[in-house]
Amino acid sequence: MKNILRAMVILLIICGTYVLFIQYGSVPEKKSNDSEPQVSNEEAQSGKRIHMPTSGLLSFMGKHADEVTKKLGEPERIDPSAYDYDWWVYNQGKDQYIQIGVLNNKVVTLFASGNDINAKPFKIGESTGEVFKTTQVAPFVNVEYKGNSYRFEFSEEDINTRPTVKVGKMYVQLYMDKFEGKLSSIRAFDAQTFVKQRPYEVVYRGELIKPKAVSDEKWKKIQTTSEKQILDLTNVIRVKHGLAKLEWDQPTAEVAFGHSEDMKENNYFSHVSKKYGSLKDRLEEGHVDFQQAGENIAYNYVDGPAAVEGWLNSEGHRKALLNSDYTHLGVGVDRKYYTQNFIKRW
C-alpha cells in the first residue's frame, strides 16, 4: 500500500512539473533560414563598446535629411529600394561613392566606398588586421526592437568578409576585400532597417519585421536603378585599382537583363541557359558587337552594392571586375537575380 501511495505522489509531481513548464516556459525561438545555419557562442559578444561618432559620414545616421543636404548638397539622383527607404546617391568616383537611405526624412541606412570617405571610427582602405585589432567581431550580433529580440548569426565567410558590429545605437557592416586584406566599404543600418533586410540567418523572439510589399511597377524602377548602382560601384572599384572606367552599353544590358529574367522565371542559376545558350550565344542573338566578353551572375543579395562586394570576394568574378581589356558593361537585374556582362569592342 505504501508503495502505491509513493508512486501516486511521484506521478502527481511529474504532472505538476509538466503543467508548470507549459504555462511558464520561455517563449520559443523561431528561425528564418535565409542563409546557412551557424552555431553561435553567447560569450563572444562581450568586448570593447564602440560609441556613436559625432562627426563623419556615420554621424548622419538617425538625423533629418536636411543635415545631409547641408553637408553633401543635393544628391545626383534618388533611387527607390525594396526596403521602404529611398537611396540618395552621391557619386564622386574613386574618392567618394555614397548612398544615403532616407525614410520619412530620416537617415536609416547608408553605404559608402572610396578613398576619401570619413567613416569614423573606421577607415576605408585600412588593413583587415587593424580593423579586427580595434573592433571585436563576434559570430553574431543581437538586436532589440520594440519588444522583439533578434540574433543574427554569421558564417565563417561572413566574419571574414562582411561582419556587422554595433556602434552606439546603429549596426555597421564591414565589407572586407579578402584578397587585399583591406576594408573595402561600409554599410550602416538602424535596428528596424537591419531587421527588414536580414543580411544573415536570424533567430528571433516576437515579430519578424518585413518591408512593405513592392508593386511590379516599383520593382521595375528598383531594378533599373540597381543596374546604375552596380555600374557606379564597379567603376569606383576599377579606378581604385588603376583601371579605366567601363562605359554603359545598352544592347549588352538588354542581354544581361534577359539572362536574369530567364533565371528567375525558370528557377535556375547558371551561365548557360537551356533556351538561350551561353553568353556568346546570347550576345550574338542580341546583335552585340564584341571581341571579348565575360559575365558575372549573383542571386539573393539584398541589393546591387551587396552583389558587387560579393563578386569582389570571389576570385573568378573579381577577375572580370578588374579585367583591363574590357571597355563596356551592361547590367541586368530582375528582383534578386543580378547579371553583369562585360565586353571589349572590336
Swiss-Prot record:
Keywords in alphabetical order: Cell membrane, Membrane, Transmembrane, Transmembrane helix
UniProt biased composition (Polar residues): 35-44
Coiled coil region boundaries: none
Stretches the record annotates as Disordered: 29-48
Location(s) in or outside the cell: Cell membrane
Membrane topology field: Single-pass membrane protein
Top-level taxon in the UniProt lineage: Bacteria
Signal peptide coordinates: none
One Gene Ontology cellular component annotation held by this UniProt entry: plasma membrane
Statement: the UniProt record of this protein carries the keyword Cell membrane: yes
SUPFAM superfamilies per UniProt: PR-1-like
Transferase among keywords: no
Principal location class: membrane
Residues spanning the membrane: 7-27
Domain (SCP) ranges: 231-342
Protein name: Uncharacterized membrane protein YlbC
Name of the coding gene: ylbC
